């Protein structure tokens, strides 16, 4: 099997469903109006690529690494981002999100310090064991999005809605919240307020 290498290329309207993609490397590439669903990425690498108006759903990874990806106006569903961290662990998969919808995603053991999720929709998603200190979630729809064993010190949740933060396992010191959503922090304490 020969490797496939692409640098500074543009891919438009690429449609992939139920495919196994092996040994591809994409550096500084742009994907526009592409759909990738139920695919397995085997030993691929995506570095500093941009995705615009793309739909990526239920993608599985087998030794694939991604770093510094940018997403704009994308729908991202069923992705376990923690499994896509590069082997050196020095960079995170996502560099920037703009006007994206994320649903059923998993972020585990990731350093997302100072990351801006601002004004993106992130629903039914789990953040576990992540460093989210000083991150921005302001204006986000976070319906049924859970935070467990995360550092969210100084994170900004103002005007965010629907989040579930386990205050027992998360460090929330100096995080910013808005009323009435801040009352959601009490959910993990299993108490009643009358």
Region roles according to the model:
Residues 1-194:
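Tandem repeat scaffolds
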């Amino acid at each position: 099997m020969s490797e496939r290498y692409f640098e500074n290329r543009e891919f438009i309207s690429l449609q992939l469903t139920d495919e196994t993609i092996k040994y591809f490397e994409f550096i500084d590439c742009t994907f526009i109006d592409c759909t990738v669903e139920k695919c397995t990425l085997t030993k691929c690498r995506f570095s500093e690529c941009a995705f615009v108006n793309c739909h990526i759903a239920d993608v599985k990874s087998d030794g694939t690494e991604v770093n510094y990806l940018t997403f704009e106006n994308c729908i991202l569903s069923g992705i376990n981002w923690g499994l896509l961290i590069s082997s050196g662990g020095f960079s995170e998969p996502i560099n920037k999100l703009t006007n994206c919808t994320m649903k059923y995603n998993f972020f585990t053991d990731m350093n997302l310090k100072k990351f801006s999720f601002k004004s993106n929709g992130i629903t039914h998603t789990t953040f576990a064991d992540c460093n989210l200190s000083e991150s921005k979630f302001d204006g986000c729809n976070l319906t049924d999005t859970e935070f467990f064993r995360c550092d969210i010190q100084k994170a900004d949740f103002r005007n965010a809605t629907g989040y579930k933060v386990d205050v027992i396992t998360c460090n929330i010191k100096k995080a910013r919240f808005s009323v009435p959503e801040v009352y959601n922090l009490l959910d993990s304490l299993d108490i009643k307020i009358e």
